[in-house]
Amino acid sequence: MTTPLKPLDDAATSFARRHIGPSPRDVAAMLETVGAKSVAELMAQTLPGTIRQATPLTLEPALSEVEAIGHMRALAAQNQVFTSLIGQGYSGTIMPAVIQRNILENPAWYTAYTPYQPEISQGRLEALFNFQTMICDLTGLDVANASLLDEGTAAAEAMALAERSARAKTKAFFVDRNVHPQTLAVLRTRAEPLGWQLIVGDPVKDLDGAEVFGGLLQYPETTGALRDPRADIAKLHDKGALAILAADLLALTVIASPGELGADIAIGSAQRFGVPMGYGGPHAAYMAVRDALKRSLPGRIVGLSVDSRGAPAYRLALQTREQHIRREKATSNICTAQVLLAVIAAMYAVYHGPDGLKSIARTVHRRAAVLAAGLRKLGFAPASDSFFDTVLVEAGANCDEIIARAESQRINLGRDGSRLRIALDETTTADVVEAVWRAFGGELSYAAIEAEARDAVPAELKRQRPFLTHPVFHAHRSETEMLRYLRKLADRDLALDRAMIPLGSCTMKLNATTEMIPLTWPEFSSLHPFVPRAQAAGYHTMFADLQDWLCRISGYDAVSLQPNSGAQGEYAGLLAIRGYHAARGEGHRTICLIPSSAHGTNPASAHMVGMEVVVVGCDSNGNVDLADLKAKAELHSAKLAAIMITYPSTHGVFEEHIRDICDIVHAHGGQVYLDGANLNAQVGLSRPGDYGADVSHFNLHKTFCIPHGGGGPGMGPIGVKAHLAPFLPGHPATDAATPSPVGPVSAAPYGSASILTISYIYMLLMGGEGLTRATEIAILNANYVAARLDPHFPVLYRNERGRVAHECIIDPRPLKQTCGVTVDDIAKRLIDYGFHAPTMSFPVAGTLMIEPTESESKAELDRFCDAMIAIRKEIAAVEQGRFTIEASPLRHAPHTVHDIADDDWNRVYRRSEGCFPEGTSRTDKYWCPVGRVDNVYGDRNLVCSCPPIGDYAQAAE
């Protein structure tokens, strides 16, 4: 007699089960610890009943990992990979395989967080230091930042920098008519809310009579023309204005640098240094400035300091410029940048070195010169005889026919009216050049035409100064050396591949391998953002699905995928609110209410759209003070534009009165911007659009699994209710029929499109039920950590039923009074236990905010809690007088191999006590490469790039 087959347990093998850390047995034990009978009961105790969604979240049925990859293959097949010679700041490039495998596909690099804890971030800080050095060398300027979001927003940031810093105090800014069109569009978006006038024209003819605070010139121009900008720069300086050059990095290896030409600021994209076009991104933009402007530079800057032993150590420098400290007075609202892409670009330069980069540039220029010679022979004279890689010709009535012939050979050309633009790159072959000639009606031989080609870089613009002279750009020529260098840097850092990263408000969850796989497929990575839409059909199917799913999750009616960071999403959402009020004849509504606990990007973003920030107080429980809100809403009723509020709150609690908050603001004519940074506590349980919010951004690099990349890339799409949908960001590449009244906030129409594949696969794999379960376990994990730590470090905020949301704030501040222990001491001591610190001093100074996410297992949560409890015992030893805080392992943390190998150990605690604290493994210990970094020294002695090799020679003498 046979035994019937048992029914299959799909949950045991589903992706959701692998994404979610705690097992069913773990969940039962954790519920017992937190004092709840079930997950459902815990949710009822955590979320206000007034906001719970009435029906379960319904998406498509969850797929297996194999099925999801098959689905992505089908989508990829709908995209057509042509050879795109469109230009406009996007180029084909070749990512060295050693970089693809060991950075882009390596979780040691892509799962790390922003390097606010420098001791455990030395690898990527060195890589970013290399990036800054590369940018300084190529631009000929003194200080560079560690990346911006894209070239268009970098130009806008440079415009704002010029307005702050120029001697001229006008409200007008000059833009060369030959900048990239998308850059001009982003500049228009940024300038209008601030009341700045853009003067767009020919700098030769139109700059003389213009009174401006700055000017932007493209170098080379978007047309390809290479023109000497020195006279234009001199005109700007004579007016007290700052001169900005948007410069092509590869071109700068063979043409004069912006610094040599007299520019004050240089901006651009590092995309063509090994980073695929990705249908628009992500790519690292750059900005470099002369020394006098360094303290106004937006974004992050890596500087060189020293550690506790006096050894060199990298850190983020001049952080007082940034939004998390300066708020509405910050130099920018930028938070997430493009660290992973900056690292790739820097390593591209390390891999090739200066000679390799010059060889690539000369090859590209040679092919362009040969192309131009052939076009002349065919009767199409280039518009300019001076160019680097792009040739522009007048095609007249033949334009459509030429484009059709090119497309029949799977080649895309750029078009501007009746003019055609052919932009070459390092992937361009002689066969491609011959195919372009055929599109223009000629059968020419590359070899025959090559002899007729002439150098198109004018002698006065040829680069004379050396670059990339530091040894790091010369020491890794072989793949063996390059591989080992990348491994050495990765080993210095602590990322999710080693341990839990319990950062509050950051949602450092699992980035599953399957989600990352399609990212490097050419069908997704090799598309130019301005190809004909028919060539990107797979992308647009994915976009439509994502927009639909995000609407179902959030309760909104429309979604824009364009914002390429959370801060950009905030900006786009506030622009939508501003546009809505203006369309109703209420453009005078400019007051934005922001709770005192808000993230620093909120007030910075409000300032950027021309709003005035009015701070609303919070009560002793961390909730918005309703009385204060009512008073300020009434006081500013006639001018009230919006409130920006985070939900659950930045204090880690679901506020009971969120509906009341929304109603109060709506009653006074305002709109509700609900910051989606904490959406990981809501998916499947509550929908912002249902309880009163009008607009939110979604941090796809938090809730929806795009990895943080060590500080970017990120994506911040926004969802809006129907009345705000007409005011979502537009783009000149997609707006021909119905232009949006709000311009673009990003250079590409769909932002960093290629990484949307990650969030898309995550949703495919999880389905509605899996996403809801992830939310529930994220909340359970946070309450479990709170329950375990509360007897040792009091949990500062809970709701009326004693629950936290998906994160909790613990309060060590009394310990500073009793024994001098600081939050910094605890954070650095956690490194000795193998952990990244929780979020420090936000939103409450001197506290720690912990967010475990749903991906961490009970075992890892216990390891973290055990470490925190052990640290509390060490603090007790200080309180009891065993040693002073200055002599304790807390103040000497983190401990390094230099400490354990110190022959002169003279501390009052044992070497093993410092280096191998209670509960840590001696076989698998993470050793940070430097001791505690001296922040004050680093800012007082600012070094932001590698010194040139000549400095080493002088030192040797």
Swiss-Prot record:
GO terms for biological process: glycine decarboxylation via glycine cleavage system. It catalyses: N(6)-[(R)-lipoyl]-L-lysyl-[glycine-cleavage complex H protein] + glycine + H(+) = N(6)-[(R)-S(8)-aminomethyldihydrolipoyl]-L-lysyl-[glycine-cleavage complex H protein] + CO2. The keyword Magnesium does not apply. The modification N6-(pyridoxal phosphate)lysine is found at K702. Its cofactor is pyridoxal 5'-phosphate. InterPro entries: GcvP, GDC-P_C, GDC-P_N, GDC_P, PyrdxlP-dep_Trfase, PyrdxlP-dep_Trfase_major, PyrdxlP-dep_Trfase_small. Pfam families: GcvP2_C, GDC-P. Keywords: Oxidoreductase, Pyridoxal phosphate. The glycine cleavage system is composed of four proteins: P, T, L and H. This is Glycine dehydrogenase (decarboxylating). It comes from Bradyrhizobium sp. (strain BTAi1 / ATCC BAA-1182).
